Design a protein with these regions (language model features):
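Conserved glycine-rich cofactor-binding loop
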Residues: 10-11
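Catalytic Tyr-X3-Lys loop
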Residues: 92-111, 127, 144, 151
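C-terminal substrate-recognition "lid" of short-chain dehydrogenase/reductases
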Residues: 120, 200-229, 234
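Residue(s) in the substrate-gating loop at a strand-loop-helix junction
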Residues: 131
């Protein structure tokens, strides 16, 4: 049985991705920065296992990857899903500590977890959850979008460095109905949906299906790609 680790796996895209892998018969581990959130999710699903670990904590990344390999004998796939956005506003005005936090979690975090997973013996693939914000700039989300643009480039760089042994791909969603993106749609869901050619927001399950495909053997000849899943947002 193969093993996957999903960072930030207690809600939204992360939780839906974890469930998708469970449905396909994988060993599934998740991380959460909050112990109470992790405990609540694990109590609802006996097939899930998890660790309390912040996305920007190198020691936690090292220990988590090692424990998973010790418990299961392998770590096959890493999903770098954990992200944050405490830094809304103009780059000229936004608090610099919030910008640093955004970049630490969204950019340094995936690098840390990928490095530690590889050191622990990662076998097959890495999947980075990027964003269309890393492709097209938008008002008031500069720090977040810069972090995702960096993650898109990092995906390609790591794909080159880790080939031929480990594949590295990414996905770039538009507005998905999650807690993290709530500020983008909660006050006017129809208006937000209308920004997409398909006139609807994404669901976490939509994204999870693409993540699973890119992580699976069905995508064994795909690496270095960042696939948009945006309902036509970029058209």
């Amino acid at each position: 049985m193969k093993t996957v680790l999903v960072t930030g796996g207690t809600r939204g895209i992360g939780l839906s991705t974890a469930q998708k892998f469970i449905d396909q018969g994988w060993n599934v581990y998740i991380t959460s920065r909050k112990e109470e959130n992790l405990a609540a999710v694990l109590s609802d699903n006996s097939q899930l296992k998890g660790f309390v670990a912040r996305a920007d904590d190198l020691v936690a990344a090292t220990e988590t990857c090692k424990k998973i390999v010790d418990e299961t004998g392998s770590l096959d796939v890493l999903i770098n899903n954990a992200g944050t956005n405490p830094s809304g506003g103009s780059l000229l005005d936004v608090d610099l500590s919030a910008v640093q936090k955004t970049w630490d979690v969204n950019l340094m975090g995936p690098l840390m977890w990928t490095r530690e997973a590889v050191k622990a013996g990662l076998k097959e693939s890495v999947l980075n959850v990027c964003s269309v914000g890393g492709i097209r700039p938008s008002q008031y989300m500069g720090a977040y979008n810069i972090s995702k643009a960096g993650l898109i480039y990092m995906t390609k760089q790591l794909a080159m460095e880790l080939a031929p042994d480990v594949r590295v791909n990414g996905i770039a969603p538009a507005i998905v109905k999650t807690k993290l993106s709530e500020m983008l749609w909660i006050s006017d869901e129809k208006g937000s949906a209308d920004l997409h050619a398909l006139k609807k927001l994404g669901e976490p399950e939509d994204v999870a299906s693409l993540i699973y495909f890119l992580s699976s053997d069905d995508a064994s000849w795909i690496t270095g790609e960042v696939v948009t899943i945006d309902g036509g947002f970029l058209l």
